[in-house]
Amino acid sequence: MILIVGGRGAGKREFAQKTLGCAPEKTLPDLQDREPLPSLEELLGYEAVICDEVGCGVVPVEPAQRARREAVGRLCCRLAERAERVERIFCGLPMVLKD
């Protein structure tokens, strides 16, 4: 499984499909928007998992939003540990974090 992270609109989905050749049906986009969050085991079944970076930017005022952000961040950390490869996309440019 490949984990792809980056800011919203940074080109993560295009990178997964065009550069890496990941099939859309085997790619989970927008992990941060899934409710409830999928389990780690479920996510490991995808070819690629795409998530917005949630550790940067303005911290939400609402406790529930902060808790959600924390849960997404921790899940991404666990995914990164298990992923074969981790890429960060910034302005459409990939940076290999793990290979």
Segments and roles (model prediction):
Residues 1-26:
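Glycine-rich P-loop/Walker A and Walker A-like loops and their local beta1-loop-alpha1 context
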Residues 6, 30, 91:
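Active-site donor-binding loop signature of nucleotide-sugar glycosyltransferases
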Residues 19-39:
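Conserved substrate/cofactor phosphate-moiety recognition/catalytic segment
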